[in-house]
Amino acid sequence: FLPDINGKLVNTSNIWRFKMIFLLYLQNNIETREIYKMKATKVLFIAQEITPYLPESEIANVCRYLPQGVQERGREIRTFMPKYGNINERRNQLHEVIRLSGMNLIIDDTDHPLIIKVASIQAARMQVYFIDNEDYFQRKFTTEDENGNSFDDNDERSIFFVRGVMETVKKLRWVPDIIHCHGWMTALAPLYIKKAYAEDPCFRDTKVIYSSYNNSFNSPFPASFSDKLLLEGIRKEDLTFTDKPIDFSELTKLAIRFSDGVIQASETMQPDILEYTKNAGIPFLPYQDPENYIDAYNEFYDVVWENAHK
């Protein structure tokens, strides 16, 4: 018994009983739970490039300032990128996170150790996690050599990067509401989330947004890519390509097919990709100018979230 505002003793057991019943109702009623939650509060950014770790580019600039802007607007964020060999670890104060490292990822019947590093952008109060591996990310370039030729193993590098992000997020025990993918290196994330990780508690309610940039690669992925990317939960029937080289257009369409929303991140977009996007039946955000894109993207997260919970 406790005194109420008038000093009268009341039986509080009934109050606590009501609270427990209400919480159990929320837990078991998905629709009510989502109304109660109202909006997506946690956003995971998977980025092909981020400045200042790499030179400025359309993707690198967006992925530097968008997470900061979204965080300043009240959402919780995590950000990942590959640890390319041309990133200066000492200057940028990267250090390995031992508790997150050590897993082996098998790609094409070969074990590849997963190494996780982290650094902070102090001005943004933002941490960036890096996916590293000696086989894939030690060369002193990003996705092309000094002559502008795409690396032959870019297909495996993209598989390793995306799977590395998924496994690390699981170890962090952090459940994202939205995953926002930037660049073709991240294009497998929608497929993996919707198929290979569909029943995982970290990702089963996650909605995926793919930002389509005009950053085509010049050498198609080999025909063996469709076999290398397979995981439990993914069938060859899920792919729009099998047993043939995969170009930028096909890879982008695969990402769009398994996404919950698409953003046109570059001012121009390949006509076939634009048409495919508009016919996909999911929310689509046209190109936004540099002055407005952070607010527009931030609002789009809730559009995608609410559309998926109608």
Go through the PLM ranges and name each one.
Residues 2-8, 100, 107:
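Intrinsically disordered, low-complexity segments enriched in small/polar residues
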